[in-house]
Regions:
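Two-component histidine phosphotransfer core
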Residues: 1-121, 127-133
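C-terminal end segment of the histidine kinase catalytic
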Residues: 118-163
């Protein structure tokens, strides 16, 4: 984020509201970076400083699930675009292809199942929130190594299912 803030000449503010509790769980590499980049590039990157461009990163745990949400107060999207952005047959306007989002969504679902992935909420001229939904996998060296090697769910090493 520091590089992006420098690139955009500190034109936006980033706030974090991440529960300490979720620091004890593993995640998949490179899933939040493309979402943050989208929030900057398509959300707040072209806003005037007078419009108070802001990105909020939230993280919390609910039962056996972890949620990481990136919200911006940028231009937002039409509901039609929101519905299509994560579909294989997506039809999104040229200003955003959605490839980064569909890539992250697909990787999460391949590893953990269809109940996990991304949730996209947006309103035109209000902003966008992309929420990452993951299983709560305890942070251990073994679990993290299994995720790195593509084991879908730690504890299922013998399933022969790899990504």
């Amino acid at each position: 984020m520091n590089i992006q803030k420098y690139r955009y000449k500190e034109r936006f503010v980033t706030e974090y509201d991440v529960s300490e509790e979720i620091h004890q769980f593993c995640t998949v590499k490179l899933i939040i970076q493309p979402i943050l980049e989208n929030a900057i590039y398509y959300g707040v990157g072209n806003m005037d400083a007078d419009d108070n461009p802001r990105i909020l990163v939230k993280g919390w745990r609910t039962d056996n699930d972890i949620y990481l949400a990136v919200s911006d107060n940028g231009m937002g999207m039409r509901q039609e675009d929101v519905k299509n952005i994560l579909s294989d047959n997506k039809k999104v306007p040229k200003h955003g292809s959605g490839v980064g989002l569909i890539n992250v969504h697909t990787r999460i679902q391949l590893m953990f199942g269809a109940e996990y992935g991304l949730i996209v909420e947006s309103e035109p001229d209000e902003g966008t929130t992309v929420t990452i939904h993951l299983p709560a996998i305890p942070y251990t060296e073994e679990n993290c190594e299994l995720l790195e090697n593509g084991v879908k769910k730690p504890g299922n090493e013998g399933d022969d299912e790899k990504t």
